[in-house]
Amino acid sequence: MTILGTALTTNATKVMLLGAGELGKEVIIECQRLGIETIAVDRYANAPAMHVAHRHYVVNMLDSEALKQIITQEKPDFLVPEIEAIATSLLVELENNGQKVVPCARAVKLTMDREGIRRLAAETLHLLTSPYQFVDDEAAFRKAAVEIGFPCIVKPVMSSSGKGQSVIRSEQDLTSAWTYSQEGGRAGQGRVIVEKMIPFDFEITLLTIRAIDGIHFCEPIGHRQEKGDYRASWQPQKMSDIALAKAQHIASKVVENLGGYGLFGVELFIQGDEVFFNEVSPRPHDTGLVTLISQDLSEFALHVRAFLGYPIGGIRQLGACASAVILPELSSTNIVYTGLEKALKANRQIRLFAKPEIAGHRRLGVVLAHADSIKHAIEEANLGAQAILAHDGDNHLSR
């Protein structure tokens, strides 16, 4: 029997979030609904999840000693990584000494870079993937691109939100693609993956939950990416029964191998009835923000329920729904918004993340929509997102 304590009491159940972005904010909110004591950690102050946590810390999470000091001080019952740029060797050490890491330290370590999870999927689990090579320098990169053939894609083994990722259509693109890949990697990593570009029909995220009562799947989520980053998502994504069965089989094999309890975002390419494995995140997925409106239990609620050790039971999908990103371009440390009255129509919702600053393009929120069809839901979400404008509050006169 799992015992759940009350926040800010002697027997409080504590969850420490490593990475305090918009996805983590929703995880914290779900923990708060269960009376859990929450601690948010990130590399910068006033990150979204810090706004709703009981306490927060600002630290470089690649610094093992600094991170260990905070964890030792707080003694959380659950360590919940929200991002990849964490000292994973420390998580392994802590787990070996009895600390609960969500879903488990091995899953976090394997998925922190593209090489670990791609080799697991293709070489250990023998799942269908695009042809690929991992390389460390420009000469090897050029050779790999020619051998794999054009068009191909280059990605840093450690990056997120499409940083450093580009499509190479000919040898003329190689120099710029290599330079960009080196600028976009996390944690000083120069290694990249070069992979064949698959002519897929569409790509999906299959949110897969490993819980005490078995494996559960959400309905497939379709999404649109630009420059490797999510711009819109919708659920359910229509696909053949054969492809769906293959997708669920692949997702099951991956999450069962990774282990632990929690929600996993399994990214797949669909080509007719064929399914190719792409990547997996052992945590809620940005495309899954649509589940805030499309399901009775969002991906965040499912993640929390699973890692606490409680059964999922069932997941009810509520019809055609979509999300669209609010992605302005400006520079400000005092962001204000207009246009919400235009965006807030029937069957639309808004989530503003309260990010403290912006320099260039940055995802500041999403609009969620429910409609009678996926096409109309996408249109409604996009119209809502376009209506919301972000401004520098220091210079905006009509506040």
Swiss-Prot record:
Entries under InterPro entries matching the protein: ATP-grasp (IPR011761), ATP-grasp_carboxylate-amine (IPR003135), ATP_grasp_subdomain_1 (IPR013815), PreATP-grasp_dom_sf (IPR016185), PurT (IPR005862), PurT/PurK_preATP-grasp (IPR054350), PurT_C (IPR048740), Rudment_hybrid_motif (IPR011054)
Start and end residues of each ATP-grasp domain: 119-308
Keywords, alphabetical: ATP-binding, Ligase, Magnesium, Metal-binding, Nucleotide-binding, Purine biosynthesis
**Where along the chain is ATP bound?**
R114, K155, S160, S161, G162, K163, G164, Q165, E195, K196, M197, I198, E203
Q: In which pathway does it act?
A: Purine metabolism; IMP biosynthesis via de novo pathway; N(2)-formyl-N(1)-(5-phospho-D-ribosyl)glycinamide from N(1)-(5-phospho-D-ribosyl)glycinamide (formate route): step 1/1
Q: What is its EC number?
A: 6.3.1.21
Q: Oxidoreductase among the record's keywords?
A: no
Record note on quaternary structure:
Homodimer.
Q: Name one GO molecular function term.
A: phosphoribosylglycinamide formyltransferase activity
Does the entry feature the keyword Transcription regulation, yes or no? Answer: no
GO BP terms in the entry: 'de novo' IMP biosynthetic process
| One Pfam family in the UniProt entry | PurT_C
- Give the protein's function: Involved in the de novo purine biosynthesis. Catalyzes the transfer of formate to 5-phospho-ribosyl-glycinamide (GAR), producing 5-phospho-ribosyl-N-formylglycinamide (FGAR). Formate is provided by PurU via hydrolysis of 10-formyl-tetrahydrofolate.
UniProt-annotated binding residues for N(1)-(5-phospho-beta-D-ribosyl)glycinamide: E22, L23, E82, D286, K355, R362, R363
Catalyses which reaction(s): N(1)-(5-phospho-beta-D-ribosyl)glycinamide + formate + ATP = N(2)-formyl-N(1)-(5-phospho-beta-D-ribosyl)glycinamide + ADP + phosphate + H(+)
Q: Which residue windows are coiled coil?
A: none
Q: What is this protein called?
A: Formate-dependent phosphoribosylglycinamide formyltransferase
Q: Where does Mg(2+) bind?
A: E267, E279
Task: Please report which protein family the annotation says this sequence is part of.
Answer: Belongs to the PurK/PurT family.
Gene3D superfamilies, sorted: 3.40.50.20, ATP-grasp fold, A domain (3.30.1490.20), ATP-grasp fold, B domain (3.30.470.20)
Say which domain of life the source belongs to: Bacteria
NCBIfam families hit by this protein: PRK09288.1, purT
What stretches pass through the bilayer?
Answer: none
Q: Record's Gene Ontology CC terms?
A: cytosol
